[in-house]
From Swiss-Prot:
Ranges for region Disordered: 182-203, 266-290
This protein's UniProt keywords: Apoptosis, DNA damage, Growth regulation, Metal-binding, Nucleus, Protein transport, Repeat, RNA-binding, Translocation, Transport, Zinc, Zinc-finger
Disulfide bridge partners, by residue number: none
InterPro entries per record: Matrin/U1-like-C_Znf_C2H2, ZMAT3, Znf_C2H2_jaz, Znf_C2H2_sf, Znf_C2H2_type
Expression induction: By DNA damage in a p53-dependent manner, and by methamphetamine (METH) in a catecholaminergic cell line.
Function: Acts as a bona fide target gene of p53/TP53. May play a role in the TP53-dependent growth regulatory pathway. May contribute to TP53-mediated apoptosis by regulation of TP53 expression and translocation to the nucleus and nucleolus.
Organism: Mus musculus
Cellular component terms per the entry's GO annotation: nucleolus
Name under which the protein is recorded: Zinc finger matrin-type protein 3
Record SUPFAM superfamilies: beta-beta-alpha zinc fingers
Subunit structure: Interacts with dsRNA.
Amino acid sequence: MILLQQVWLPLPNRPSTSPPMSVAARSTRTLQLPPQKAFGQEASLPLAGEEDLAKRGEPDSALEELCKPLFCKLCNVTLNSAQQAQAHYQGKNHGKKLRNYYAANSCPPPARVSSVVAEPVATPLVPVPPQVGSCKPGGRVILATENDYCKLCDASFSSPAVAQAHYQGKNHAKRLRLAEAQSHSFSDSAEAGQRRTRKEGSEFKMVATRRNMNPVQSNSGPYFNARSRQRIPRDLAMCVTPSGQFYCSMCNVGAGEEVEFRQHLESKQHKSKVSEQRYRSEMENLGYVQ
């Protein structure tokens, strides 16, 4: 028992013994090396993130210029109100074009991502921005309806609600009134042109005097009547000139044929002149002479 106590008692004093200083120094040196490497790696990561953010910030600023509150230059759509703008920017067509825009302006992705990103760009149904020249147009044709496109205003819509809001807006109503006014003015000008041709052909057309083919009678004198052998009506006897042409002194209009001269006598111009002459003569008879 005594021997055991002597052996057991020195045992608690052993932990006070420390290892040599060289061993502690080695352990600390080995522990200090990995944090330095990790610290260098961690310091390089934020720099790479800032570069990526700087690269992504450029297309975002350009995108703000394309997507205005009332005009989407990316989709070439004019918006009339805030509700219509919200419906357009939340629509599928704008989302597809937005994805294509990011795919066209983003940094060159790795080989695996390029195959995935290239698929939506090459789809024939989605129109590609003019910056991307590698996309080929598809052979499928989609017919646009009133809910998709307004030919009068040259505007496309992403949903029927947006189309209905456009057709009820002020811009569409203004364009519609202008189109109707232009169509009415064109029809009025066409009718006026037809009336002018009729008047020129019937009332105001001067017929050239026909010369007599007989050389003996043509030299018979200045008062030779070419219609001497023809029967001249009594009511038109005072309207025939010595050269054989019918003449209206009131309207200062001449005609070579009896039919054309009678058409002039039945025209509105001649009748208005006659009524004006009668009114003047009546006023002169009554003593109202200016």
